[in-house]
């Protein structure tokens, strides 16, 4: 009974505690044990590991190579040191700079540059240092372009002497343009058969005079000097003169002026057309004097067949000297015999 009363008193005092009867070691004795209330369990979340960066390099695929180029450790250390010395952003920029510096030696050793075959398909960006992946063009390319530009004006024989051109037809140092005779040097090239070729410049005789080739080219394609006077007295279109200047200078080279005259209307062209004074022009020595005058009256004085084809063009500043020139021209056209009126 006492134990039961004690149980009731304990229940009244401790309302929240749970009483669990337990049998002691001795029979007949009962002990009460209190258990703590249930505690909420906290879940500990493990810290997530950061995502792994891909080890694949960002690169542009090139034929025959992978992502990396294997090199000795000493060479890699030198490239790394040079990158710091030149203050480049990457080692690849330093290697690109080294290739550009060694381009002349590479061309001398291999005959070609370091431009890959698939250069057109690569997406190459210009770096901040201004370096590019382009190799300098070979000397034969520049010589070929210069020859094409000079051949239009007929001066190719002055740029390249025939004795300096190699006689080996199979050599690749000069392009095909130099190994074959130019069209301007042989006027009979069009009359030949398609299978036949003109003689090569290297096969010419050593004692050939280069002046003959120059004179033949000048006689074949004479330079033309353009004169466009605009007389204020005329209301219609003025004449545009093309004066041929040949190398011989004789009267046989003078052609009909009507063949080199074109008419144009100055009203369609805004601005003022000033006349040009050709003071002294010596064809043989390529000497030319130019002067600009304010007046539009032009007088033409042509010298004789001597003096190497000298042609003088003068400007008249007044109207009266021009009439005198026209009087001289009419006298030349209508010669008088001595003693006749």
Curated annotation (Swiss-Prot):
Please give the start and end residues of each transmembrane region.
none
Q: Where is the composition biased (Basic residues)?
A: 50-59
Superkingdom: Eukaryota
Q: Where is the TCP domain?
A: 55-109
Give the subcellular location. Nucleus
Which is one Pfam family of this protein? TCP
**Known InterPro entries for this protein?**
TF_TCP_subgr, Transcription_factor_TCP
GO terms for cellular component:
nucleus
Keyword DNA-binding in the entry? The reply is yes
Q: What is this protein called?
A: Transcription factor TCP23
């Amino acid at each position: 009974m006492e134990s039961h009363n004690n149980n009731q008193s304990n229940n009244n005092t401790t309302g929240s505690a749970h009483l669990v009867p337990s049998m002691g070691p001795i029979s007949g004795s009962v002990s009460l044990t209190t258990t703590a209330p249930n505690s909420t369990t906290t879940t500990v979340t493990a810290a997530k590991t950061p995502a792994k960066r891909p080890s694949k390099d960002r690169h542009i695929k090139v034929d025959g190579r992978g992502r990396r180029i294997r090199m000795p450790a000493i060479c890699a250390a030198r490239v790394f040191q040079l990158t710091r010395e030149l203050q480049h952003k990457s080692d690849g920029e330093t290697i690109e700079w080294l290739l550009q510096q060694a381009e002349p030696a590479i061309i001398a050793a291999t005959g070609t540059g370091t431009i890959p075959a698939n250069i057109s398909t690569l997406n190459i960006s210009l770096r901040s240092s201004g370096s590019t992946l382009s190799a300098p063009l070979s000397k034969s390319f520049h010589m070929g372009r210069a020859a094409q530009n000079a051949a239009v004006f007929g001066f190719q024989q002055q740029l390249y002497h025939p004795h300096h051109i190699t006689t080996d037809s199979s050599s690749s140092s000069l392009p095909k343009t130099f190994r074959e005779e130019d069209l301007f040097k042989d006027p009979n090239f069009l009359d030949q058969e398609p299978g036949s070729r003109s003689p090569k410049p290297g096969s010419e005789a050593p004692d050939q005079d280069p002046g003959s080739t120059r004179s033949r080219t000048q006689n074949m394609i004479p330079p033309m000097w353009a004169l466009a006077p605009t007389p204020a007295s005329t209301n219609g279109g003025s004449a545009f003169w093309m004066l041929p200047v040949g190398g011989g200078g004789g009267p046989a080279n003078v052609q009909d002026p009507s063949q080199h005259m074109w008419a144009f209307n100055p009203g369609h062209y805004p601005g003022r057309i000033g006349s040009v004074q050709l003071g002294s022009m010596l064809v043989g020595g390529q000497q030319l004097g130019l002067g600009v005058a304010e007046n539009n009256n032009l007088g033409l004085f042509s010298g004789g067949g001597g003096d190497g084809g000298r042609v003088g063009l003068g400007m008249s500043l007044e109207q009266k000297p021009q009439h005198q020139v026209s009087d001289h021209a009419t006298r030349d056209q209508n010669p008088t015999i001595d003693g006749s009126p």
